[in-house]
Amino acid sequence: MGFPIPDPYVWDESFKVFYQLLDDKHKQIFQGVFDCAKDPSSAAKLQKLIEVTAKHFSDEENMMQQSKYSGYPPHKKAHEEFLGKLRGLRAPLDTAGLDYCKDWLVQHIKTIDFKYKGKL
């Protein structure tokens, strides 16, 4: 059992990684998951979530590479696995798919992302 899933599903200060670009992208991903949960039949909202997530992962990985962050390889692998699963989802989204996305994002930020605080 990991960190609790916020309800309503919104970003709050407890998710802060202290890099403005990354915090802003995390907020956008939270909003994307929230929007998909609100309208699970919308393929457009799912596609936007995928695009925002892919862009964020790219930005975050670039920062890790530039700073020579030692945790980069497993972090990138986690991103690739999640993005693969996200791209495999189809609208209408079922509860299991939405719950997976919600839980993954919370656990990823609070465990894996928090490891790079102060190192990028």
UniProtKB/Swiss-Prot annotation:
SUPFAM superfamilies: Hemerythrin-like
Residue numbers binding Fe cation 2: 60, 75, 79, 108, 113
InterPro entries: Haemerythrin, Haemerythrin_Fe_BS, Hemerythrin, Hemerythrin-like, Hemerythrin-like_sf, Hemerythrin_metal-bd
Function noted in UniProt: Myohemerythrin is an oxygen-binding protein found in the retractor muscles of certain worms. The oxygen-binding site contains two iron atoms.
Protein name per UniProt: Myohemerythrin
GO molecular function: iron ion binding; oxygen carrier activity
Keywords: Iron, Metal-binding, Muscle protein, Oxygen transport, Transport
Residues reported to bind Fe cation 1: 26, 56, 60, 113
Disulfide topology: none
Coiled-coil regions, chain positions: none
Keyword Lipid biosynthesis: no
Family, per entry: Belongs to the hemerythrin family.
Highest classification ranks of the organism: Eukaryota, Metazoa, Spiralia, Lophotrochozoa, Annelida
